[in-house]
Amino acid sequence: MSLFKAYARVLTYLKKEKNTSLLICAANVMLAIITIAEPILFGRVIDSIAEKSAIILTLTIWVCFGISHIIAYVLVARSADRLTHRHRLAVLTESFERIIAMPLSWHQQRGTSNALHILLRAIDSMSAIWLDFMRQHLSTLVALFILIPIAFNMNWRLSIVLVVLAIIYVLIARLVMRKTKDGQAAVECYHHNLFQHVSDSISNVSIVQSYNRIREETSALHNYTNDLLKAQNPVLNWWALASGLNRTASTISIVCVLLLGAFFVAKGQLRVGEVVAFVGFAQLMISRLDQMSNFINLTVSSQAKLQEFFSMEDSTFHINEPENLPCLQNVKGTVQFHHVTYKFPNSSQGVFDISFKVKTGQTVAIVGPTGAGKTTLINLLQRVYEPTFGHISIDGINIRSINRESLRKSLATVFQDAGLFNRSIHDNILIGRATATNEELYEAAKIAAAHDFILKKTDRYNTMVGERGSQLSGGEKQRLAIARAVLKNAPILILDEATSALDVETEARVKDALDCISHNRTTFIIAHRLSTVRHADLVLFLENGHLIEKGNFQELIDKGGRFYKLLKAGGLIIDQPTIKGEDKNVIPLREAIAS
């Protein structure tokens, strides 16, 4: 993307504030005209003094122009600042909404922290460009276009000096842009590496401290900063050189204007006031050219990060589902996989040709070794991923033909990682259903065996759970996640190893609650416990992404296939009768696999 295209696209983000932006720009154009008038009036004041003629009127007009310029500039600058900050937050919010709505595959490919880094850096750059556009860019262009003809009208010979100066500025800018293009792209790459390392180290701070990696991680950060500086310094050197060359050219231009002006005054071809006015023109043009140079510097330095942001934005529009898709309503819970295949990008892993049907209210246990595709299967049902081949239907409706929001309203999921926000316990449970009453929320917590431990906390339901639930134990986090799913009260329940972090006693209580809420509700369970599998209506045994066996527990035992071998090898956790000796779920392994 060229520099001009990047700049133009940045300005398109102002279209929602088009009227206000145009009004500010129009005011800036008027300011540019006033600015050009000032040196002319000042020159006439000098001529009036030199000729000892009436000066009051000219001086008054000049002073009024100056005061008006100051007041107008303050008002325009304030309006531009307010609009920029307001719109910066608006674009940030809109982009954030699109990013978090992206499928998990999008985040896995790009990296969530990387997407955040791109977003924040690009928003900062765009807001700086917006502000400069409304304050300076347009008025600078207008001033230059008006200034040159007026200068030629005053004295074409002195004007040639200004034209040469403008050409020198343009040539210097083109040279520096060409020399720094690759370097600036490398700088942006090193910025990403640095941010990624910092984010990675902090998010794994427990591992860093446990394995005494503080010195090594800090040393690695020093290496990243050194690489960044090695790439950044040549770019900075070129822009410093450009600044020096511009200053040299502008100084020489002023000297030339003064010398030529003195020569023409001596010959009687110019008045002193005209020379003074022309010097003012030259200084005005130099300031405008400096502004243009700074603008080019800003845009060039932002070009790489803006291109990444635009690429990310385009991908969100490309992946987003079509508008006006119908909603999934009155869900009964019949789920069917029709020859579903999904393969992870750049990997041989995935699920392949999966077909099965679950009737309304049935419980499905998904079993298999690590990496078999159990969680992938669940993610496909939630449209975290989209099948490469085949399709999934709920109540006979292809889930790709309905909008994701309505689909996910019909699903309540408890993940292996509880996924808590750094908010209060109350707010974390309320995520299940934002319109729920406190009584409904408390009841959900009781069902999930969470109410008692919550009441023992100092602030009870107002207790902050910390980042990702760091202030809670594993079991407490899991019970809050279950309470959240209970509160949602969706027709399809998904339990991704939901009780894996619970002790035996708590699990027994939670299992009773889950049995209660899964009654007459289609339930998918990624299972590692024998009792769960034994009471499932349908058991799916996955291996290497393929559905090897399916049927109820006894059918798979009688078959004597891979599921049977998994049981014999101790591949499922056998419940220990530490709570209720008479619990029907607690059976010896030999009884479970008895032929």
Curated annotation (Swiss-Prot):
GO molecular function, one term: ATP binding
Keyword Plastid: no
Domain ABC transmembrane type-1, chain residue ranges per copy: 21-301
Gene3D superfamilies: ABC transporter type 1, transmembrane domain, P-loop containing nucleotide triphosphate hydrolases
Residues the entry annotates as binding ATP: G368, P369, T370, G371, A372, G373, K374, T375
Listed transmembrane segments: 22-42, 55-75, 128-148, 152-172, 248-268
Known EC number: 7.5.2.3
Annotated catalysed reactions: [(1->2)-beta-D-glucosyl](n)(in) + ATP + H2O = [(1->2)-beta-D-glucosyl](n)(out) + ADP + phosphate + H(+)
Topology of the protein relative to the lipid bilayer: Multi-pass membrane protein
Entries under PANTHER family matching the protein: ATP-BINDING CASSETTE SUB-FAMILY B MEMBER 10, MITOCHONDRIAL, ATP-DEPENDENT PERMEASE MDL1, MITOCHONDRIAL
Quaternary structure (record): Homodimer.
Name of the molecule in the record: Beta-(1-->2)glucan export ATP-binding/permease protein NdvA
The organism of origin for this protein: Bartonella quintana (strain Toulouse)
